[in-house]
Amino acid sequence: MDLDIIRKNNFGQLSYCKDCGTFHLTFSNILIELSDRELRAFHMVVKEIDIDFWKNIPNNQTVRRNFPINTSQQNLVLIFDFYELEALKELVMISESKRKDFIS
């Protein structure tokens, strides 16, 4: 598997597999394989999270993760704390031109 690392931080990395033509987002103990279209959609989902809204919602959970991201799998929601969300943004908020550099 020939992976080009696009971005990396303490929580994970975003890479591109030339062999399979997919982006690989590893984040803590999560691996998500995304097509170009799926990465663009995920980018928009992450970008549009209303941080102020979710910060003000009382969280009675023992794990203090306030920021949910719904997935297409009905019974799976990814949850992040503020620092994890910022790290996730750092990985997936790449420009259109940078993304296209890898797929062309």
Region spans (language model):
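Positively charged, low-complexity terminal tracts
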Residues: M1-S104
